[in-house]
């Protein structure tokens, strides 16, 4: 459909309008606008997220194209946009007290976060290599600035510089790859590139080099090995509120962005990029799970956890095509989509507890800070235990089903050795997740002060934990949504 009704873009426009309104209020009202800016960001993203969710659940919705087919609204985009929008809303609720204690409760944080969210929306709905790239840069530039908000804090500025320099390098790779694909196919639109590549009348060498550079760019944004160097330093160096913004929605958007690039644009070259993803996935699983064992800083440990989890997402991406056939593609890509959503939900809960333990002039970042948490707050200790079980893949947490679905897709693709590697490395990873559980329940607390968070945050954290358990017991509805979105969107 070429001339789709513009009403399909209203939730995206709502986020843009909220940015403009919040920016004007923050500029002309000043410090007194902090509370207003927070509520504008929260309300707009919750409404947009619910709107996206309603669109995603509307039966019979097909792709709708806008702006000369550069932007697409389809079931896949609606689901992922709902996830990142609601994920951002939860992030700022968890971050509020943390920001107030550190003098960061200001419009800049919320504005940069919303600009990052807008970039994620563009990444998810991009139907053109240029649109996908612009969405990526809008997201990335906002995150660089957000990480460096504490200019007087050396670790924060160092983390921002590392992220910026390596991000610029990855953007260069990506642009070079896109330019080679454009030179070979004569188009930047995903559908046209797909047709041109499928025709087989294009220089294979140019295509292969283009794919290599694009895969490198995708791997960097997902934090996959060997393009992971920025992840541990950024997670540890940035204030925890910024770490959650970086490690939450952008990971989901990066997966959606990679799916658009590789599947919607370069599916005929699946044999080529699959081989590269196999290497990236294997390295990510090994490095993420084994290196995480020796970490004493919880944020750095969760960074290596993110790397290993992106390895699982890559498993789902590479398992979609078997011997050039796409019969099992919907199941594989649906499992990867399900995994990325589950990872976001679990990450929100994990960092929510980390920020809950932090207080003015104190960061709860070491393993010792979790000792005896059950004695200080049984509810929050239970929530953290559920999150660790999910990350480790222990039932009944939803992480178990997510890992099982990806492993099944990998086995069906004939990559048994890779599935076995994933299981073995996950056993290593389970050690550092269960170590936190042991510290919370079997060690004496260093600080016996009871933990009391605000009512909103307590309620949201409890719901976060319940969601992980309920989805683990009844994963079918969410998996069905993912499979439906994939089957009605991708060229399978």
Swiss-Prot record:
It is found in: Cell inner membrane. One of its GO terms (molecular function) is quinone binding. The keyword ATP-binding does not apply. Pfam families: Proton_antipo_M (PF00361). Keywords: Cell inner membrane, Cell membrane, Membrane, NAD, Quinone, Translocase, Transmembrane, Transmembrane helix, Transport, Ubiquinone. Its main location: membrane. It catalyses: a quinone + NADH + 5 H(+)(in) = a quinol + NAD(+) + 4 H(+)(out). It comes from the Bacteria. Its EC number is 7.1.1.-. The chain crosses the membrane at residues 5-25, 37-57, 72-92, 104-124, 129-149, 164-184, 205-225, 239-259, 276-295, 302-322, 337-357, 380-400, 414-434, 466-486. One of its GO terms (cellular component) is plasma membrane. One of its GO terms (biological process) is ATP synthesis coupled electron transport. It is a multi-pass membrane protein. NCBIfam families: NDH_I_N, PRK05777.1-5. Belongs to the complex I subunit 2 family. NDH-1 shuttles electrons from NADH, via FMN and iron-sulfur (Fe-S) centers, to quinones in the respiratory chain. The immediate electron acceptor for the enzyme in this species is believed to be ubiquinone. Couples the redox reaction to proton translocation (for every two electrons transferred, four hydrogen ions are translocated across the cytoplasmic membrane), and thus conserves the redox energy in a proton gradient. PANTHER family: NADH DEHYDROGENASE. HAMAP family: NDH1_NuoN_1 (MF_00445). NDH-1 is composed of 14 different subunits. Subunits NuoA, H, J, K, L, M, N constitute the membrane sector of the complex. This is NADH-quinone oxidoreductase subunit N. It comes from Paraburkholderia phymatum (strain DSM 17167 / CIP 108236 / LMG 21445 / STM815).
